[in-house]
Amino acid sequence: MSGFTEGNAVSFEGGVFSPYLTTRLPSWAGVRQNVVGSNVDGRPVAPANSTTLTYATIGSSVDTAAAAAASAAASTARGMAADFGLYNQLAASRLREEDALSVVLTRLEELSQQLQDMSAKMALLNPPANTS
């Protein structure tokens, strides 16, 4: 691909191959219509307003779907292995939060017991009036 400028305009000659499936966007999204795009492998993709939205695939659709799922799983596993420290931090943070919650619950039990003791003492000091 080559480009040149004329005044304030820039012109390009040749093909532009994008790794993004922009031709799958609807017409109202501002995407040029009737333009053949390409998928991430460089295979042609019919335009979004085409009557046949198909990919040029080599294998069957089941094989293609299985390969895509395997690729996604491998990518996720690699990401998890690379960011394992992040998961350890999250686990440690959760343990700290559980410890703090345990302290709060213990304190709440102590306060409840003190309230019951005070209520019992108040009941002894002020016997209920007999309304019979």
From Swiss-Prot:
One of its GO terms (cellular component) is host cell nucleus. Its main location: virion. GO terms for biological process: symbiont entry into host cell. GO terms for molecular function: hexon binding. It is found in: Virion; Host nucleus. InterPro entries: Hexon_assoc_IX. Induction: Expressed in the intermediate phase of the viral replicative cycle. Residues 101-121 form a coiled coil. Keywords: Capsid decoration protein, Capsid protein, Coiled coil, Host nucleus, Host-virus interaction, Virion, Virus entry into host cell. Pfam families: Adeno_PIX (PF03955). This protein is only encoded by mastadenoviruses, and may therefore play a role in mammals tropism. Belongs to the adenoviridae hexon-interlacing protein family. Homotrimer. Interacts with hexon protein; this interaction tethers the hexons together. Self-interacts with adjacent proteins. Interacts with kinesin light chain KLC1; this interaction leads to capsid disruption at the nuclear pore complex during virus entry into host cell. Three N-terminal domains of hexon-interlacing protein form triskelions between hexon capsomers. Structural component of the virion that acts as a cement protein on the capsid exterior and forms triskelion structures consisting of three molecules that stabilize three hexon trimers at the center of each icosahedral facet and fixes the peripentonal hexons. Dispensable for assembly. During virus entry, recruits the anterograde motor kinesin-1 to the capsid docked at the nuclear pore complex thereby subjecting the docked capsid to a pulling force. This is Hexon-interlacing protein. It comes from Human adenovirus F serotype 40 (HAdV-40).
